[in-house]
């Protein structure tokens, strides 16, 4: 059985140890001969890499492990790139969240002006990774779960249309794990779903068990009462996420024929979100004080002790979808998965060039979309507005256009007026001068 070589792009990420543990747990399904880390921040990556080196030696000593800041070393002789980069790190995420809040607009990592700001930083970084992969390992595939996935996917469609890149998001998976728990199922894989939308902007339209029984009525009853707020074993859910999962019941009420993605909260209830935000302490601060501190602390402890035996780092079970996706490509498994792909008729009454999130059958040639047919006017109207925000953002990046970025922010449902959009944009330009292209 062939053993694979992978590079994790974003080696210094707080998610990297959990992903490495998940890969090591799945070696029977997806054998690995080599794991490489690549990051452009050597110091940050080193802390994570030293710990992962020990973890790999203890759990799978035959795997060759390399960490580097050199693209040629990282991207030569690989089968898969697993990409989760955050250009500007959490310090810039904090600005993405706090700048809009100063103007009375919600501040969120991937939604509204904050998401647009993050997108403008991410495009260049992801395109650079695609180019390294194609230069040094032209037969490799990139599994990209870098945020904001919608803007990144549109950018790769426009700028690298023939590249072997699969854009995927774990949020629907996280919600499906909760749905399965609510329905008393062993796994989300016991459900067969139909879903359509854009990334962080979609709806489940049909959920059945493997025998074809409709699970939507039972789910509707529960979601109408508690949203998606259920206890998941081994998952430590922070207060801000509990609020999001509970608020899903209000999002659901707007169209009870479907099940919503939780991110719709930011578009339907922006006033509520602003009211419940602390402009001086946002989600970025929560992450820096919580997960970032914990992961880096644990990694330093592993390096000091020389063993990971008592480590509290845990497997990122969520991330097992990455193995499912890699296996689908490697072994032609025809796995059914939600991916972000060019619409091209999957949603018959929607822009064929839009990057939509729909179920696909994935094999060694990539994804084949499952047609979702016509979508209702309500969702279509919302999606046309949102996809225009994403397309204008990518055009603004490509053309260095201030005008188009102002239009993109103005068009976001989260922003009340063009004058507020302009004020936010001017502040974001100042904050991002080391990261964005120059806008004229």
From Swiss-Prot:
pH dependence per the UniProt record: Optimum pH is 6.9-7.3.
Chain positions recorded as NAD(+) binding sites: 4-70
Binding-site residues for substrate, renumbered to this chain: 93, 147, 283
Pathway: Glycan degradation; palatinose degradation
A family per Pfam: Glyco_hydro_4
Cofactor descriptive note: Binds 1 NAD(+) per subunit.
Residues annotated to bind Mn(2+): 169, 200
Domain of life, source organism: Bacteria
Cofactor requirement: NAD(+); Mn(2+)
Xref: Gene3D superfamilies: Lactate dehydrogenase/glycoside hydrolase, family 4, C-terminal, NAD(P)-binding Rossmann-like Domain
EC class: hydrolase
Keywords: Carbohydrate metabolism, Glycosidase, Hydrolase, Manganese, Metal-binding, NAD
GO molecular function: hydrolase activity, hydrolyzing O-glycosyl compounds; metal ion binding; oxidoreductase activity, acting on the CH-OH group of donors, NAD or NADP as acceptor
Record's note on what induces expression: Induced by growth on the sucrose isomers trehalulose, turanose, maltulose and palatinose.
Gene Ontology biological-process entries: carbohydrate metabolic process
Function: In vitro, readily hydrolyzes p-nitrophenyl-alpha-D-glucopyranoside 6-phosphate (pNPalphaG6P), a chromogenic analog of the phosphorylated isomers of sucrose. In vivo, is probably involved in the degradation of the 6-phosphate derivatives of the sucrose isomers trehalulose, turanose, maltulose and palatinose, catalyzing their hydrolysis into glucose 6-phosphate (G6P) and fructose, which allows the bacterium to use these sugars as energy sources for growth. Is not able to hydrolyze the C2 or C4 chromogenic stereomers (i.e.
Subunit description: Homodimer.
PANTHER family linked to this entry: 6-PHOSPHO-BETA-GLUCOSIDASE-RELATED, MALTOSE-6'-PHOSPHATE GLUCOSIDASE
Family to which the UniProt record says this protein belongs: Belongs to the glycosyl hydrolase 4 family.
Protein name, per record: 6-phospho-alpha-glucosidase
UniProt organism field: Leptotrichia buccalis (strain ATCC 14201 / DSM 1135 / JCM 12969 / NCTC 10249 / C-1013-b)
Gene this protein is translated from: pagL
């Amino acid at each position: 059985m062939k053993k694979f070589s992978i590079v994790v792009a974003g080696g210094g990420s707080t998610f990297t140890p959990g992903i490495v543990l998940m890969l090591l747990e799945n070696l029977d399904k997806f054998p690995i001969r080599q794991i490489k880390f690549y990051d452009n921040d050597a110091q940050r990556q080193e802390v994570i890499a030293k710990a992962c080196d020990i973890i790999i030696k203890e759990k799978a000593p035959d795997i060759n492990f390399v960490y580097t800041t050199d693209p040629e070393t990282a991207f030569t002789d690989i089968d898969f790139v697993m990409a989760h980069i955050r250009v500007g790190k959490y310090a810039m995420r904090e600005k993405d969240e706090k700048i809009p809040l100063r103007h009375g607009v919600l501040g969120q990592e991937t939604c509204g002006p904050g998401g647009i700001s993050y997108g403008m930083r991410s495009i260049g970084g992801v395109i650079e990774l695609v180019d390294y992969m194609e230069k040094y390992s032209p037969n490799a595939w990139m599994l990209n779960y870098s945020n904001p996935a919608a803007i990144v996917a549109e950018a790769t469609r426009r700028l690298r249309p023939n590249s072997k890149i699969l854009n995927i998001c774990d949020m629907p998976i996280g919600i499906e794990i909760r749905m399965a728990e609510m329905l008393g199922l062993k796994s989300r894989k016991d459900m067969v779903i139909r879903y359509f939308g854009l990334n962080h902007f979609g709806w489940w339209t049909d959920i059945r068990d493997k025998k074809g029984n409709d699970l939507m009525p039972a789910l509707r009853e529960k979601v109408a009462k508690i949203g998606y707020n259920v206890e998941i074993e081994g998952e430590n859910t922070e207060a801000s996420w509990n609020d999001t999962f509970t608020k899903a019941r209000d999002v659901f009420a707007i169209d009870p024929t479907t099940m919503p993605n939780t991110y719709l909260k930011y578009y339907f209830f922006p006033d509520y979100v602003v009211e419940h935000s602390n402009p001086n302490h946002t989600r970025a601060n929560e992450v820096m004080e919580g997960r970032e501190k914990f992961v880096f602390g644990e990694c330093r402890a592993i390096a000091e002790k020389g063993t990971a035996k008592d480590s509290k780092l845990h497997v990122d079970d969520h991330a097992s979808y990455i193995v499912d996706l890699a296996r689908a490509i490697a072994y032609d498994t025809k796995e059914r998965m939600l991916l972000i792909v060019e619409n091209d008729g999957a949603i018959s009454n929607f822009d064929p060039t839009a990057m939509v999130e729909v179920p696909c059958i994935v094999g060694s040639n990539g994804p084949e979309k499952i047609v979702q047919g016509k979508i209702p006017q309500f969702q279509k109207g919302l999606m046309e507005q949102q996809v225009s925000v994403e397309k204008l953002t990518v055009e603004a990046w490509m053309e260095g256009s201030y005008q188009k970025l102002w239009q993109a922010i103005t068009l976001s449902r989260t922003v009340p007026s063009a004058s507020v959009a302009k004020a936010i944009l001017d502040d974001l330009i100042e904050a991002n001068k080391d990261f964005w292209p120059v806008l004229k």
